[in-house]
Amino acid sequence: MEKWVIAAKRADFNQIGQQFHIDPVIARLIRNRDVIGEDKIREYLSGTVQELPSPWLMKDMEKAVDILEKKISQKAKIRIIGDYDIDGVTSTYILMKGLARIGADVDTYIPDRVADGYGIHAHLIERAETDRIDTIVTCDNGIAAAAEIQMAKDKGMTVIITDHHEVPYREEKGERRMVLPPADAVLNPKQYDCPYPNKNLCGAVVAFKYIAALYERFGVPAEELEDYYELAAIATVGDVMDLQGENRILVKEGLYRLKNTKNQGLQELIRANSLEDAKITAYHIGFVLGPCINASGRLDTAARSLALLNAKTKEEAARLAGDLTALNQSRKALTEKGKEEAIRIIETTELKNDRVLVVYLPDCHESLAGIIAGRVREKYHRPAFVLTGGETSAKGSGRSIESYSMYEELVKCADLMIQFGGHPMAAGLSIEEKNIEEFRRRLNVNCTLTDEELRPKIVIDVPMPVSYITKELVEQISLLEPFGKGNTKPVFAQKNLRVLDHSIIGKNKNVVKLKLLDPQGISVEGIYFGEAEDFVNFIREKDSVSVTYYPEINRFRGRESLQIIIQNYC
């Protein structure tokens, strides 16, 4: 059973409201997102990309720019090695387009998920040597590839790493010491001694910062960076970064530009998903457009997503957008099948008693492991790993909960794995099949999660009577967008609503439409998306219902009315 708690953060909400011309409820929502102080509130409400930190603050930026300035003047061959997910594809595109603009002799290689695996491997170094590549620039990978980088150095190549993943470390006398690869320059804000203020950039934004510094060095007008904002937004949301500070400003700007994008591929992807007349939000990136870009790297080759971004004609872009949208539909069906199998295994074995779930699906496509792990995590509110079969070993992904640092727990099991990497909330690994059971056992032995930490928590921003909702308040709530990780959609709550009427609607009969009455006698329309039958059975047995909700303006056939979207009930 979920635990409902009220965010009890304090501030003078009336004073903040008066100073910034916002409702005190909005001031409370901002405080609940840990935005504190006049400067931070002003940045949150009206920050612009012109105020973002200089790329030159990033450790090794000067060195990385100096290297490519020299290499470009020497007409040296440069290869970008990216990654097959949405962040890797957009990073590759940003670097490729940016370097070409300043005259670089540049090509790209995005590893195949199955044939190559994640990141830079020995055979990619050998291929670069065969192709007479002088300089390798990685994006969204490389920070954990010390051996491969050393191999490239031994062959006389120059290597620049741009990455955002956790920096490998070793424990020495109770202290963590970074284990950096021997690259010529490393751009990663997570380096302990990197002064760049935002440690939570995605790979594409690290790449964007590099291009911004290079453009400045080469005298390219700053306005030419504007085409990259939409890609930074797509990657930031698609790679599930916190929408706070710089990230939120970049996504806000990127969404604004995306609706009028000049990129043929993105135009056609928007059209293929029937969004050409929609107000595109972070939700559309996270759950519609982003999964299409990711789908090619999961089920085919990510080169198709890169080709979409590179498309020069409407016809080519439309064909690729259609292909990626169809691939995503296939991915959805395979994901559902894998999720159902994972749940069946958990429910029928001793796994159901584990605090950290490790599910082995030998016949599942390896690219779906992360998505299925996320679905399992959502259902059980426990850290979840899903492993899939491979030719020589199992591969998999993990998705975590806030109180469990997945990467740190993997470090404790490093001897059992062939390779691993990731973040506190997500990780990837490869492991010999014979070690899976010991991996599961050790993760659970090491696990210190309490029953309270494993109980899902619904944090209510404001207990607010529905009678307080106005069109003006709903419009002010939109100032808090874009919503996502780290800047969640507000949660309001109302007790004791009477259900005057209800009906199940929708093509799949999974939507409940309601007419509700609050204790003050104010009526409001409500909508519930979810297990419609369970909800209807609940309200039939009760005189009233308490709900968490989000208010909206329902626009239909030229008419506007207020309604609440019911999120949880009891």
Predicted regions, residues:
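Short, well-ordered strand-loop elements centered on a beta-strand within folded domains, enriched
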Residues: 177-178, 183-186, 392-400, 523-526, ...
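Mid-to-C-terminal polyanion-binding domains and interfaces
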Residues: 70, 74, 316-360, 412-570
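Residues at the C-termini of beta-strands that transition into short coil/loop
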Residues: 112, 188-190, 388, 570
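Hydrophobic helix-and-loop "lid/oligomerization" segment in the mid-to-C-terminal part
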Residues: 6-135, 155-156, 173-176, 182, ...
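Catalytic domains of riboflavin
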Residues: 1-3, 479
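Histidine-centered active-site/metal-ligand motif
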Residues: 164-165, 365, 423, 511
